[in-house]
UniProtKB/Swiss-Prot annotation:
EC numbers: 1.1.1.267
Binding site for Mn(2+): 148, 150, 219
PANTHER family: 1-DEOXY-D-XYLULOSE 5-PHOSPHATE REDUCTOISOMERASE, 1-DEOXY-D-XYLULOSE 5-PHOSPHATE REDUCTOISOMERASE, CHLOROPLASTIC
Gene transcribed to yield this protein: dxr
Reactions performed catalytically: 2-C-methyl-D-erythritol 4-phosphate + NADP(+) = 1-deoxy-D-xylulose 5-phosphate + NADPH + H(+)
Cofactor: Mg(2+); Mn(2+)
Source organism: Leptospira interrogans serogroup Icterohaemorrhagiae serovar Lai (strain 56601)
Binding, NADPH: 11-14, 39, 122, 124, 203
Entry-linked SUPFAM superfamilies: 1-deoxy-D-xylulose-5-phosphate reductoisomerase, C-terminal domain, Glyceraldehyde-3-phosphate dehydrogenase-like, C-terminal domain, NAD(P)-binding Rossmann-fold domains
Protein name, UniProt field: 1-deoxy-D-xylulose 5-phosphate reductoisomerase
């Protein structure tokens, strides 16, 4: 009996790695449905190979004529609202949320309330509305297994340890493409340089986030909500080799770390198979081949966005939501060559300073905070353009 999987964000790097796992285990999993934003050619390729029941094209500007309303046996749905329809399908058992950005929030909530098992790779969901998501997970008794490599590593470690023995959890980070660049040279970083990452092959937005360690800041906030750990018990270390993905420090002074070859198939396979063990070797990487492992504290002058994430997380309420939305809006400006790489955290800081922090009870209130933050970034940019004239 195969398990039916709904994959949101099939054309991205996490989506492609998920398809690798499904491809390797056809006896265990069936791709019931998937979504793409606008990559229609990729959708055709996946449909031809897996023949799912449904495809959702979430972009409002997609050319409906390319796929039509049906492709073979596969029904084609359009628009962001259809993402929620996909995850609510009765046959779906596991939902993998690999969509980047706050657009993943509503379908994630739909999966939780529909009682699906959730493999969560969309960190923005917990960052933007963590308290709300936590309450829904508890209310619906939803099984959530994180798909991010660091959170999945910590999930596996914490699952095997006595909670009373844990002192601190540590997220590892490669440090990105600019970890050894003199700080004074960060002001001249180009878009082409910022779109390169030394370890992971990812989409443009998450690559830029990673190179400024803002991505790690988002992961800190996500870890707080996933594991119910206070911020002063969450640490970050730079680990250039990207072999250790998570570390748990114990109260007796000992530590456990989770290590594997840096490949997303490990956390994805674990998320899909959990609580069963993954039945075969994904990629052997014995300790004798690791070489030297380095760990060092991050420099907050080099990575101001990481410090801002800790601050926003500790403030709580809508502060993490504003942090995330301001970052998304600032990265968009950077990708359009309208601001410099080092200005991204400046826009986040100024947006957090301008907006009053609220403590919402509803999804709509979080979404309003998100909207206001994006609008504030655009207004800040417009004011700076005027003042420069």
């Amino acid at each position: 009996m195969t398990t039916s999987v709904c994959l949101l964000g099939a054309s991205g790097s996490v989506g492609e790695s998920t398809l690798k796992v499904l491809r390797a285990h056809p006896e265990k999993f069936r791709l019931h449905s998937f979504s793409v934003h606008s990559n229609l050619e990729k959708a055709k390729e996946i449909q031809k190979e897996f023949s799912p029941d449904f495809i959702c094209v979430s972009s409002d500007f997609a050319d409906v004529g390319v796929l039509g309303n049906k492709l073979g046996r596969t029904q084609i749905l359009y628009g962001e609202s259809s993402l929620c329809e996909l995850v609510r399908e009765p046959e779906v058992e596991i939902v993998i949320t690999a969509i980047v950005g706050s657009v993943g929030l509503r379908p994630t909530i739909a999966a939780i309330t529909a009682g699906k098992r959730l493999g969560i790779a969309n960190k923005e969901t917990l960052v933007t509305s963590g308290p709300l998501i936590q309450s829904l997970i508890a209310k619906h008794n939803t099984k959530v297994v994180p798909v991010d490599s660091e959170h999945n590593a910590l999930f596996q470690l914490l699952e095997s340890l006595n909670p009373n023995s844990v002192e601190k959890i540590i997220l590892t980070a490669s440090g990105g493409a600019f970890r050894d660049l003199p700080v004074e040279q960060l002001s001249s970083v180009t878009k082409e340089q910022a779109l390169h990452h030394p370890t992971w092959n990812m989409g443009p937005k998450i690559t830029i986030d990673s190179n400024g360690m803002i991505n790690k800041g988002l992961e800190v906030i996500e870890a707080h909500f996933l594991f119910n750990v206070p911020y002063d018990k969450i640490g970050v270390v730079i680990h250039p080799q990207s072999i250790a993905h998570g570390i748990v420090e114990l109260k007796d002074g000992a530590s456990f770390l989770y290590a594997s070859y840096p490949d997303m198939i490990f956390p994805i396979a674990h998320s899909l198979f959990h609580p069963e063990p993954v039945p075969k070797v994904l990629r052997s990487y014995p300790a004798k081949d690791w070489g030297k492992l380095e760990f060092r504290e991050p420099d907050f002058k080099r990575y101001p966005g990481l410090g801002l994430a800790f601050e926003a997380g500790k403030v709580g309420g809508t502060a993490p939501c504003i942090f995330n939305a301001a970052n998304e809006a600032a990265v968009e400006l950077f990708l359009k060559d309208e601001i410099r790489f080092i200005e991204i955290p400046d826009y986040i800081r100024e947006t957090l300073d301008e907006i009053k922090i609220e403590f919402p009870l509803s999804l709509e209130e979080y979404e309003e905070a998100d909207r206001i933050a994006r609008e504030t970034v655009r207004n800040l940019k417009a004011r700076k353009v005027v003042s420069a004239c």
